[in-house]
C-alpha cells in the first residue's frame, strides 16, 4: 500500500503483473500508468544497475510522486503523457523496438476516486470534473452543460452501459435549463431519481458516472492507441501486460490480442496472392485471463473486477 495526500492506494495484482513481465536485470521497461508507483517500485527492485524504467501518467499528483521516485533512483524517469503517446516518447528516446516489457494498469486509481476535489465519485461530493489531467480538455461539468441530449445519452449507453440512458440524459438536460451542474452529488441525485430500476448493491448513478469519466478522458481511444504503440515499442520476446477493470476495456484488450495471434489473415483480400508472413502470429498469449485471489479481494474489494492479460511479441 502507498499513501498519497491521506488517500490509500493498494496496487492491484502487484506481484502477478510484475512476474508476468519476466523482468530482466538489464531490461528497459515502460509503466504506462504510473499512478502511485506500486508496480514501478517492484519492477525497479528487480532491475540491475543497467536496467531502465520509464513511467507515464496524465495525473499531476502521480507525476509529483514519480518525480520524487526519480530523484531517489536514477534508473527511473517519469513523463506527464498519456500512454497513448508512448510511441512518440519511445521514438524520441531511441527506444523503438528495444523495450523489454510494457505494463498498463487501466482505469481510475483509489486516490482519484477518494479525493472529492477530483470529481470522480458520486459518494464524496466535489466539483464535477473527472479529468485525469485537470489542465487539459473539458470537465464533466462543461460536457454536461453543453452537449445535446442525444450525445449525453450516447455517452451513458456506450461507455456506461446504462440501459436507461435516454431517460437519464433527458433528466439532466431538463435540470440544466434551470440550474447548471457544478457538483458530483447534485448530478448523482438527478440520475438517481431518473433511474427507474436500481440494481441491488449498486448506486443508480454508477454507470452514468463511468460513462462520463471514460468520455471526458477518452479512455477507450487512448487504450486502442496505447496497445498498438506498446506492441511497436517492444523487442521480439518483449511482454505486454494489461490490467483492465470493466468489460469495455477488457473487450478491447482481448480482441486486440486475438487479432494479433491470427496474424493478418482476417484482413486479407480474397483470391489474391499474399505473403506468408501474413499468416504468422505477431504475438502469443501467455495463459488465461487472470483475476485477483480471494486473499487480495479480502484486502482490497476494488480488485474484484480486475482482469489481467499477458502477451509476448513474436515478430
Swiss-Prot record:
The domain of life is Bacteria
Q: What is this protein called?
A: Ribosomal RNA small subunit methyltransferase H
Q: Which organism is it from?
A: Pseudomonas fluorescens (strain ATCC BAA-477 / NRRL B-23932 / Pf-5)
* Reactions catalysed, as given in the entry: cytidine(1402) in 16S rRNA + S-adenosyl-L-methionine = N(4)-methylcytidine(1402) in 16S rRNA + S-adenosyl-L-homocysteine + H(+)
Question: Which gene is the coding source of this polypeptide chain?
Answer: rsmH
Enzyme class (EC, first level): transferase
Give the GO cellular component terms, alphabetically. Answer: cytoplasm
| SUPFAM superfamilies, per the entry | Putative methyltransferase TM0872, insert domain (SSF81799), S-adenosyl-L-methionine-dependent methyltransferases (SSF53335)
**Which family does the UniProt entry place this protein in?**
Belongs to the methyltransferase superfamily. RsmH family.
Family annotation (Gene3D superfamilies): Putative methyltransferase TM0872, insert domain, Vaccinia Virus protein VP39
Q: Does the keyword Oxidoreductase apply?
A: no
Q: Which GO molecular-function terms appear in the entry?
A: rRNA (cytosine-N4-)-methyltransferase activity
Please verify whether the record's keywords include Protein biosynthesis.
no
Q: Which GO terms describe its biological process?
A: rRNA base methylation
Where does it primarily localize?
cytoplasm
